[in-house]
């Protein structure tokens, strides 16, 4: 596991990343619950998902939305958090160019952002 500070739209985004041993492994971005209600990348279910995806052979990243932990910026009611997620997904895809499978998963608020990210990705295809 590697600690990262990824450049984001409102400053640095704190992340934890585990790279698979396989060059063509699937990738996954994990999104945490509502920051305004105490959600972080360390939330129990997000941490467990992180471990499960690593065990399944995925290159896996979880991160804190803006204003949480070491991530810079302020909570933006979902709009800015979607930008954060898109930025982290872009970083992950650029770092794993041989991956053909990409997942995005979240819990509660994180699932809502994940669905928006999927819709945004479909628009840009």
Residue ranges of model-derived segments:
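A domain-start/cap signature at the N-terminus of enzymes
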Residues: 1-4
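Serine-hydrolase catalytic machinery in alpha/beta-hydrolase-like enzymes
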Residues: 6-8, 12-97
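Aromatic pocket-lining residues of Rossmann-like dinucleotide-binding sites
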Residues: 53, 117-118
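Hydrophobic packing residues within well-ordered alpha-helices of enzyme cores
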Residues: 85, 114-117
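Alpha/beta-hydrolase fold nucleophile elbow
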Residues: 97-107
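Gly/Ala-rich beta-loop-alpha elbow adjacent to hydrolase catalytic centers
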Residues: 106-114
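Conserved small/polar residues in nucleotide/adenosyl-binding loops
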Residues: 123-125
């Amino acid at each position: 596991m590697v600690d990262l500070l990824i450049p984001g739209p409102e400053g640095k985004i704190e992340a934890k990343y585990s790279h698979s041993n396989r060059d063509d492994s699937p990738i996954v971005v994990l999104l945490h619950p509502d920051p305004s209600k105490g959600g972080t990348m360390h939330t129990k279910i997000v941490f467990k998902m992180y471990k499960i995806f690593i065990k399944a052979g995925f290159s896996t990243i979880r991160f804190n939305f803006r204003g949480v932990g070491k991530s810079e910026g302020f909570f933006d009611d979902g709009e800015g958090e979607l930008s954060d997620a898109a930025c982290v997904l872009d970083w992950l895809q650029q770092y794993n160019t041989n991956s053909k499978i990409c997942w995005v998963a979240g819990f509660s608020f994180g699932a809502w952002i994940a669905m928006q990210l999927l819709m945004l990705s479909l628009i840009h295809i």
